[in-house]
Amino acid sequence: MIEHRCNCKMGVHRAPLEKYIIRKGAIESLPEVLGEYSRVYMVCDDNTYEALGKRAEELLLQVGKFSHKCILHGDVLPNSESIGNVLIHLNDPKAEADIFRYSPKPDFILAVGSGVINDVCRLVSYRLGIPYGICGSAPSMDGYASAGSPTLFDGTKATIKCTTPQYIIADTEVMSRAPYEMLLAGIGDMFGKYTGILDWELARDYNNEYFCETIAAEVIAAADLCLENGYELEARSCKCIENIMQGFMVTGLGMAFTGNSRPASGSEHIIAHSWELDCVERGEKPNLHGLEVSEATLLVAYMYRLLYAETEDMHLKTLIEKYLPYFDSVEKFCRQMKLPLPVTRPDEMLAGIRRAVHLRDRYTILFYLRDQRALERYAEYAVAKLCERL
């Protein structure tokens, strides 16, 4: 367990994460890390099995700790189909059944992948009371250490509170070989911390919500670290990947420490989730989450800039002002590194903002503008500004 003493009203922040290893060749430490377990159930997809799962299986077989595996095929989503497949394969389906006993369970679930695989295994782990860990395949999102699983169910996407992994293994050499768009997506996910933390401060001051200065400052510093190192992504430097993953650990633990996703997401994530739901409803494969977050971050930043220019509330103006340099840095990075904008139609951008305000009961700039009867005008302004870049 990781403990973090703090001056906020919580006093002590705790997360059940035992250990994380971020370095070149980290996968080789897997047998030692899982020393206390003997029946490891591995979950991966077709791509992550080839990238990392095959080696993980070899290492665990060598020390007699491997039980069996579940490989999820096709475009894997964090939905009932994926969760059901992981549950069905929890015990080797080929194993002989004993009608006088319940199905034997593995003593550890090893997720091999990034966002979706981690989310599915986290939820199964929590529901069944089986500890789990993750071997990360790409620095594509910041939720490795978080305690929530974004899940598609009942026609929406919601984050279900679960637990953190016990162990996180991030082999930077393996991660550096991930598709370039996934590397950009990880950076894009971190850009949302600037608007997300500002939304959190807005909720503290205008909705009387709990706020932790220490965690917020650590998350901003982690986002800065990722932004500074992001320019080296094209070179696929292991050191660059290591720094980015260290930033991810801070934001993931921030979510676990506070018991909610405030330290890592705000209006930009809700807009991104709205776009993702639109894709699912159309029967299309969702875009990379982090790229949608970076695009939504630009939209939210435009709304905050306009609010800064128009508001007569001096406290609000001062609050927004300290984030303006961050917004400028994000926009510069997106332009210079040519981050893809996955949603390009103005009507789809607007529809995402309109839907987002109803998607989650979380106080953000969207709620503030709605209460001021100004959301539609600000949304149209932000979309027009972003479309100037297309």
Model-based region annotation:
Residues 128-224:
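A glycine/threonine-rich phosphate-anchoring loop and its flanking beta-alpha core
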Residues 216-329:
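Active-site segments that bind and position negatively charged phosphate/pyrophosphate groups
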Residues 1-2, 6-7, 306-390:
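C-terminal charged capping/lid subdomain of soluble metabolic enzymes
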Residues 96-124, 128-137:
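A short, small-residue-rich loop immediately preceding and capping a beta-strand
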Residues 24, 37-49, 182-186, 350-360:
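N-terminal low-complexity or amphipathic/hydrophobic leaders
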Residues 79-87, 91-105, 253, 257-261, ...:
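Non-transmembrane, aqueous-exposed alpha-helical and coiled segments at domain scale
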Residues 214-228, 232-235, 371-390:
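Long, charge-rich alpha-helical interaction segments
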Residues 1-108:
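ATP/NTP phosphate-donor binding region
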